[in-house]
Amino acid sequence: MKRFLLPFVMMLVFSAESIFTDLVHFPFVTDDQVLAPRFLMLVLIFMSAFINQKHAMIYGFIFGFLYDMNYTSLLGVYMFGFAGLCYLASKAFKVLHTNAFVVILIAVLAVCLLEFYVFGIQSLIHKDIMTFNGFVLDRFIPTILLNIAAALILVLPFRLFFMSLKKELRDE
């Protein structure tokens, strides 16, 4: 039964990003600053840490494609970004321990890499999209702070969920 629960949970996380963006407004964030929740990226990194690389890359590819279809005009940016970062994170987890601190650190690093990757692709296509300083001050720093807080909140519930799912997958 938990096998069908994973796609449902991932769809909820996918939907939670846009709901969070629409409904949550912080008083200390100016109108110029952008808080981009990357909950899906965090959960995919948690999946690569606690289940396995194959599941994380498949879900990263599928949900990256859905992300591209819903939020961008360019197909493939998030699709390959999510899957590639899941691959890199799983290789890092083979070397490092998968305790909560290391998982949070790698997840936040993956969000950093994703933000710079997307900014790089967008700045190649649209030359006048945003300056690098504007990107760092108005988008990157608020996004990273939000995702650090989200990673701290989400790591333990998803660790328990993924560990029980991994046990059930192993038993089958």
Swiss-Prot record:
State which residue ranges cross the membrane.
4-24, 33-53, 57-77, 101-121, 143-163
Query: Listed GO cellular component terms?
Result: plasma membrane
| Membrane topology term | Multi-pass membrane protein
**Cellular localization per UniProt:** Cell membrane
InterPro entries recorded for this chain? Cell_shape_determining_MreD
Record-level GO BP terms: regulation of cell shape
Major location (coarse) = membrane
List the signal peptide residues.
none
Q: Which terms are listed as keywords in the entry?
A: Cell membrane, Cell shape, Membrane, Transmembrane, Transmembrane helix
The job of this chain, per UniProt, is described as: Involved in formation of the rod shape of the cell. May also contribute to regulation of formation of penicillin-binding proteins.
Q: Can you tell me which family this protein belongs to?
A: Belongs to the MreD family.
The protein, known as: Rod shape-determining protein MreD
Q: Which organism is it from?
A: Bacillus subtilis (strain 168)
What lineage does UniProt assign to this protein's organism? Answer: Bacteria, Bacillati, Bacillota, Bacilli, Bacillales
